[in-house]
Regions:
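Active-site recognition of the HExxH zinc-binding catalytic motif
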Residues: 96-109
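Post-HExxH zinc-binding segment in Zn-dependent metallohydrolases
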Residues: 113-134
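Alpha-helical scaffolds flanking conserved acidic
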Residues: 91-96, 118
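Zn2+-dependent metallopeptidase catalytic core
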Residues: 12-31
Length: 134
């Protein structure tokens, strides 16, 4: 797994080693692009506001396409009002979203399609439970 950070100040919840172990377990060898809130090219005013505030309203904090996972995390260089506990309780924190996207990667490897959200969610939760995170 190759890690690409936007500004270098973004911190991965649980640490980089945990993220690498999760990716290795799922067989992901692509790039993880890490963006701080308010950074990155997602269009739309509502999405930009969500990145600034950390409130996603049903949107995840990560995105998958074959060979690339984008993750949005709170960054010290961004002015983000970020409630980590609220996202953690809803399983919408960046680590849970990353595990969910790894579920899409596993789907893509088996079926060459990655659109089944229920399977990805289940795989992500099982992966986190296996590593003792949840």
């Amino acid at each position: 797994m190759r890690l690409s950070r936007y500004c270098g100040h973004e911190r991965l919840p649980g640490g980089t080693r945990l993220w690498q172990r999760l990716a290795r377990r799922a067989g992901f060898r692509g790039t993880v692009a890490v963006y701080g809130y308010g950074v990155g090219g997602r269009p739309g005013g509502a999405q930009r506001k969500a990145e600034r505030t950390g409130v996603q309203y049903g949107m995840v904090l990560a995105d998958y396409e074959p060979g690339l996972i984008r993750v949005w995390v709170p960054c010290t260089c961004q002015a983000a009002d970020f409630d980590v506990d609220q996202l953690h309780d809803a399983h919408e924190d960046p680590l849970a979203s990353f595990a969910h996207e790894l579920g899409h990667h596993v789907q893509y490897g088996k079926r060459r399609t990655y659109f089944n959200e229920a399977v990805a969610e289940r795989y992500g939760r099982l992966l986190l439970r296996e590593f003792g995170v949840r």
